């Protein structure tokens, strides 16, 4: 009976040791942004010296300074459903000297800034491409030194070209010459 009790105690101890080791490998994730899209009035995307601003005018979204393109709503939906919900997972560095390695410094990274209705900053982050995992990327909040791996790659959803965000409006319908002439 004592041997059976000893074996049971050993199994319980091994179970708890195994659980504690597995917890070290568990990745905790949290939101990069804690912003709701209905609070966003404008967002800016900047890569190198190229930037684009997308702003809300009443209930519609427009590319700032570009009145020839109509915004593609699927791009705005991507911002709401993918960018604002991206998760940061494991921290890969807290050393600012390694920002270039992870492409999250000001010159290599892609910066997105969200603004509210009174032009206050709601959130600002720099995303960098991962050279080893194409389906994920790195992120650093602008005022922080920690660099995190994200749960998915959002860089392909953030572009600075106006034609990525908008498309030319369809041409007006042609009026046939016979339609404009009426005989009485």
Task: Give the positions of each predicted feature.
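Secondary-structure "cap/kink" motif recognition
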Residues: 1-184
